[in-house]
Amino acid sequence: MQTETFDFIIIGAGCAGLSLAYRLADTKYKVCVLEKNSNNVVTNKNWSFWKTYNHPYEKIIKKSWDSFSVSYEKQRAVVDCKNYPYQALKSKDFEEYTKNKITNSNNINILYDVKELQLKDMKDGVEVSSSNFKLHCNHVFDSSPVNLNSSIWQVFKGLYIEHENLDSIFKIPHLMDFTDQKKDEFHFMYFLPFTNTSSLIESTYFSKKENLEKLSEDYIKQFIKDEYKINSYNIISKEAGKIPMSLHNKFQSGRYITKIGSYSGVTRPSTGYTFLNIQKQIDYLVKNIDTKNYNFRYKPHSKYLLFMDKIYLSIIENDAKKGKIITFRMFEKINQNTVIKFLSDIPTIADIFKIIFSLPKLIFIKHLLKVLRNE
């Protein structure tokens, strides 16, 4: 079997893999992307984030908002985010946009239906093989899933619906609605209005289990009926997924292999926000790729934020009701730019202290000590 040689091999054509291939398109590097699914498989998810970092996908942003709201029981807080607009991007649009550039480039190949890959470190790179090909490259960027020992998972299920009067409910995103009856669990509803007649309504848990058993489509339908007083609507599509809220991911898998994407540690443990963190990681890799020193040491989160996340996740895991109250109060009481920067990995030291001082002192100290005992 003849071995074909590449500069880089990218494993996985998800958000991270396609983002990296998109940046490397039409460069001097010869690149091969290996994807386990067929070319016909298209994901249908919504990626949302505050625009705190410039990304190259502004043309395909589905919608952008200058404010959003959160609620707890009968209290509602409307938050201004003009400085950092809340943006929504459809994964389907992202895949089409990036693949269009990649497939029209002269330096990137994409192979689909790739199963049972074997990676072998060589003295001058990596040998990547399957039953029907053998490849060699200088470096592998691997976005494939790995088994994680995560204590908490964010699991979600959503319905895209059409109804003539949806704009009468919320005209802006309702990011966290804690008004349901699941008081002993960290659960919230999420409402994203794309047009006057179409919205995404999602049920989200922070759960110790990574399965989707808690997520009931019937619950979402009942919530729409009880809270929004809507009995008849069209379901356009559905989405479901899980995000590890892990604090222990590794970035480097070997001398010639670098993990990228969700399973490399870029996902913010306390929020699950991933898309912009992937773009930051990819920009770092592309910027440093010309040095030919592939011992990348990218750290997506500061040690201070990770420590704060440990405390926050400890509260959620052990006292979900207080976790919901704290989350709501943070949006209600603290300057909106401070909160958004904190949740988006770009806070100043002053922002971090403002967040700390806003927390209920007894709860903060209790879980601070709990985290320190487990260090």
What is the meaning of each model-derived region?
Residues 2-33:
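N-terminal Rossmann-like FAD-binding beta1-loop-alpha1 element of flavoenzymes
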Residues 7, 138, 257:
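Conserved acidic residues
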Residues 11, 142-143, 259-261:
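Redox-cofactor binding/interface segments in oxidoreductases and associated redox assembly factors
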Residues 23-74, 157:
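N-terminal FAD cofactor-binding segment of flavoenzymes
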Residues 51-113, 121-124:
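A conserved beta-strand/loop capping segment in the N-terminal third of enzymes
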Residues 105-231:
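Predominantly flavin-linked oxidoreductase catalytic cores and closely associated redox partners
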Residues 181-183, 207-285:
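FAD/FMN-dependent oxidoreductases across multiple families
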Residues 283-375:
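C-terminal helical "tail/cap" subdomain of flavin- and related membrane-associated enzymes
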